[in-house]
């Protein structure tokens, strides 16, 4: 997860570090130094069809990349301030040349850079990230619509079945129009094989923050919003 670019010349590394610190300090309450922070990369989500038979389109990924800047990293989607462990300071959509999705288009994903302070309390987590133990992530977000790839109807309003082909067209649900990004979490088993996306919205419910909280059972957070 952590990227080490040993091949870059020193002047490039210095410029990159300066740019990173400028973005980190835009989020921090006081100016941090490179020695005080640990940075690592995460693959948040992609445009591959996931275990739920759903996927984001490329445009929605670009929208999510912008929305996730500044969002907290937590554990298992447990919405508690005590669980905040890292924060995203940069995100972009990347493509893997030569790779296609099950839907037949070019594969792309949201790559994010996150930071956390190098404190005694974070040392164990940093070591787990470096060792590849804490690796899989899942995101909590909302989208404007979820439609059938075959007919374009809203999810649940047609008879097409995920995984089946109709006149050669694979059926899956396409998630379009990012509305909000809530958080990203370290999890054991993400919905997406490469990253992980948590999506438990009914097709009839507008995908708002309160709807997400009700679906996930976060009563305390709902009380704070109300």
Language model features by range: what are they?
Residues 1-219, 224:
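Signature of dsDNA virion morphogenesis modules
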């Amino acid at each position: 997860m952590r990227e080490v670019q040993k091949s870059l010349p020193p002047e490039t590394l210095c410029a990159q570090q300066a740019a990173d610190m400028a973005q980190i300090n835009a989020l921090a309450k006081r100016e941090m130094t490179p020695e005080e922070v640990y940075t690592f990369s995460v693959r948040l989500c992609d445009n591959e069809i996931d275990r739920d038979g759903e996927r984001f389109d490329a445009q929605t990924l670009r929208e999510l990349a912008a929305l996730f800047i500044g969002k907290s990293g937590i554990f298992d989607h447990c919405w508690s301030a005590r669980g905040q462990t890292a924060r995203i300071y940069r995100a972009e959509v990347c493509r893997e040349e030569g790779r296609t999705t099950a839907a037949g288009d070019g594969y792309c994903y949201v790559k994010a850079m996150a930071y956390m302070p190098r404190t005694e309390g974070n040392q164990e987590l940093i070591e787990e990230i470096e060792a590849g133990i804490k690796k899989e992530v899942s995101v909590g977000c909302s989208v404007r619509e979820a439609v059938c790839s075959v007919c374009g109807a809203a999810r649940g309003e047609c008879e097409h079945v995920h995984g089946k082909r109709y006149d050669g067209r694979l059926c899956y649900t396409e998630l379009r129009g990012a509305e909000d990004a809530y958080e990203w979490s370290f999890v054991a088993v993400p919905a997406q094989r490469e990253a992980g996306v948590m999506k438990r919205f009914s097709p009839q419910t507008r995908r708002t923050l309160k709807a997400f909280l009700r679906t996930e059972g976060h009563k305390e957070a709902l009380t704070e919003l109300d």
